[in-house]
Amino acid sequence: ADQAADYEIIYGMCPPQELKAAANLKWLCCSFAGVDAYTDETIYPNPDVLLSNSSGAYGITISEHILMVTLMMLRQMPKFEEIVKNREWEKGLSMRSICGSSITVLGTGDIGTNFARRAKALGAKVIRGVRRTKKAGDPAYDEMYTFEELDSVLPKTEILVMALPATKETNHILSRERIAL
């Protein structure tokens, strides 16, 4: 905090309550997309501080990670590893595939769309996008819905991917009740 007074640029994640100490701050570049916590000008030492986010920087990397985790869940990887470790070859596992599945992508920005493209390439039966507006999205999406329509989409969903920025609108968008739909 003592050095913060000298900072002109901060990149990464800085607690909003600590920004006032950066008296010379000119630019706060967040290493994530959702910057709602940083939009109140009163948290800065002066109103001229430039705020930017990193929207679009992680689409490929994070979507590939989501794809990997999705496949691990569909193929019951932790159980499979246990079978291999214990040499219990006679045990079989039911494994599911992305091919032929119904996927809902909650958040159709860079990360969500990169995931949808990859899932489409693997043969997903239908990919639904859910976002603020219903405007046409990337061709990877077969159907597009708004956040207000989420409850009607979830019952048709086999795989749900959340790729949302941290904003007031998206905070707590899912609940046990909603997931149970």
PLM segments and residue spans:
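Generic structural signal for small/hydrophobic residues in well-ordered secondary structure
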Residues: I10, L28, I66, I103-G107, ...
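Rossmann-like adenosine-cofactor binding region
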Residues: T133-L181
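Glycine-rich NAD(P)-binding loop of Rossmann-like domains
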Residues: D48-L50, F80-N114, E143
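A short, aliphatic-rich alpha-helical micro-motif
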Residues: D2-A5, L19-A22, I98, S152-T157, ...
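Short gly/ser/thr-rich secondary-structure transition/capping motifs
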Residues: A1, E8-M13, I83-K91, P139-F147, ...
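Phosphate/diphosphate ligand-binding glycine-rich loop within oxidoreductases
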Residues: D6-V84
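Aromatic pocket-lining residues of Rossmann-like dinucleotide-binding sites
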Residues: A119
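Short, well-ordered alpha-helix to beta-strand connector turns
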Residues: A5-E8, A22-L25, G123, Y141-D142, ...
